Amino acid sequence: MLKFNEYFTGKVKSIGFDSDSIGPASVGVMEKGEYTFSTAKAEEMTVITGSLKVLIPGSPDWQTFMPGETFYIPGESEFNLQVAEASSYLCKYLS
């Protein structure tokens, strides 16, 4: 079953799904802007289009991820994103 999510007054939208091959995940799009997200479970995020500049918890430096690149966010944490142009991503929720 698909689950539709909307954050930051519609600037971030995603569709959650459960896949036999990758488990629980979502695919989404972020408009240009700056965002702070909280996580319950650890997440593996892969950029599909655009780019995401991320301040990963525990890291002092911002890192930019391009299409095909993946980064990991620990569970029960908060992370910051800067998005320079509309960008899409795949997020896998890890156990």
From Swiss-Prot:
One of its GO terms (molecular function) is thymidine phosphorylase activity. Belongs to the nucleoside phosphorylase PpnP family. It comes from the Bacteria. The keyword Glycosyltransferase applies. Its EC number is 2.4.2.1, 2.4.2.2. One of its GO terms (cellular component) is cytosol. HAMAP family: Nucleos_phosphorylase_PpnP (MF_01537). InterPro entries: Ppnp, RmlC-like_jellyroll, RmlC_Cupin_sf. It catalyses: a purine D-ribonucleoside + phosphate = a purine nucleobase + alpha-D-ribose 1-phosphate; adenosine + phosphate = alpha-D-ribose 1-phosphate + adenine; cytidine + phosphate = cytosine + alpha-D-ribose 1-phosphate; guanosine + phosphate = alpha-D-ribose 1-phosphate + guanine. This is Pyrimidine/purine nucleoside phosphorylase. The keyword Transmembrane helix does not apply. Catalyzes the phosphorolysis of diverse nucleosides, yielding D-ribose 1-phosphate and the respective free bases. Can use uridine, adenosine, guanosine, cytidine, thymidine, inosine and xanthosine as substrates. Also catalyzes the reverse reactions. Keywords: Glycosyltransferase, Transferase. It holds the Pfam family Ppnp.
